[in-house]
Regions:
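C-terminal catalytic "cap/lid" subdomain
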Residues: 2-326
Length: 326
């Protein structure tokens, strides 16, 4: 009887390649990709087929700055195309780094990056209330000019200038989801929905059309995890464990919580929208759709978390056994 393949999906932010203390030089990003590749290879060596979803916040921000600086010489691209460009560049760095790390361990496994369109609802309320800042800071004069000429929504960031804000709609379908699944089950490492994927809508003629928006990568990862039915969904973040009362004297780490407890803490405001909130919502959606287990931790503690010695696990109920996946 053939052994059932085990699928894992790991999601991490774009700051894994451009941390706050770095400029984002190409060599820096490549070195950071190599460090990330060591963790990816560790999961593969433990017997999992792997899907990778990464963020692109710093990268797409830098690309938009480049375009603004060159706007008088080269026509700028729209945000959906910029997302595709960063999917390609970041995918290449991760592909090369992971392939080389696998070769170091004599593992013959192909890595593939998919430029991934992700469907959003054109009637999503986010389109009426753009709130996600992207790109460079502008002077008040330039912001007014862009609002007038391009109909951009702009917000002031006290003391820093004005920034463009775009919608952040919820993903409802991954266009190439069966390609992602089939490649992963065929033994390929799949890098998909980088930056949350390229947001598209279905227009009045029934065709896909790109939109100026960004999709939260944790929501996109959760959607893939649900549709592909992965066995383990890993979300890397900046802290070892999810905490209650984060940053307060009564802060408390949570090693394990049920989906019901996670929803309760979320409703109580324990997990802010701009940080842990989307990760917890993504976890809840995955478990409620029949997912098995979520692991949330940081890169430094991932190996320990994979053997139940660190991190936070989110499960369906307390009766579920917590057994090391490795």
């Amino acid at each position: 009887m053939p052994i059932k393949q085990r699928l894992a999906l790991i999601a991490f932010g774009g700051n894994a390649l451009i941390p706050e203390n770095q400029r984002g030089l190409q060599d820096e990003q490549m070195q950071n990709a190599e460090r990330a590749a060591q963790l990816m290879a560790h999961i593969v060596r433990k017997g999992y087929e792997l899907i990778i979803v990464h963020g692109n916040g710093p990268q797409v921000g830098n690309l938009l700055i480049q375009m603004e600086e060159a706007v008088t010489k080269i026509p700028p691209y729209s945000l959906d195309v910029c997302n595709a460009m960063t999917e390609g560049s970041m995918g290449f760095m991760l592909e090369r780094a992971i392939t080389n790390e696998l070769r170091r361990h004599s593992i013959d496994k192909e890595v593939i990056t998919l430029i991934t369109q992700v469907l959003v609802d054109r009637s999503d309320p986010a389109f009426e209330h753009p709130a996600k800042p992207v790109g460079p800071f502008y002077t008040k004069y330039r912001a007014q000019q862009l609002t007038r000429e391009k109909k951009w929504a702009m917000v002031e960031d006290a003391g820093r200038g004005y920034r463009k804000v775009v919608p952040s709609p919820k993903p409802i379908d991954v266009v190439p989801k069966w390609i992602v699944r089939d490649l992963a089950l065929a033994g390929r490492i799949v890098i998909a929905a980088g930056g949350g994927g390229i947001p598209v809508i279905i227009n009045n003629r029934g065709f896909y059309e790109g939109v100026e928006a960004v999709i939260d990568k944790d929501y996109a990862a959760s959607l893939i995890a649900r549709e592909v039915k992965v066995d383990l969904f890993i979300i890397l973040t900046g802290i070892e464990r999810v905490c209650l009362n984060f940053g307060k004297p009564n802060e408390r780490e949570i090693p394990v919580m049920t989906v019901e407890e996670a929803q309760k803490y979320l409703d109580e405001g324990q997990f802010p929208p701009g940080s842990m909130g989307p990760k917890i919502r993504a976890a809840i959606e995955y478990i409620k759709a029949g997912g098995k287990e979520i692991l949330i931790t940081d890169a430094n503690h991932l190996k320990a978390a994979l053997i139940n010695r660190s991190g936070t696990r989110i499960i369906e109920d307390r009766g579920q056994s917590i057994v090391s996946p490795f």
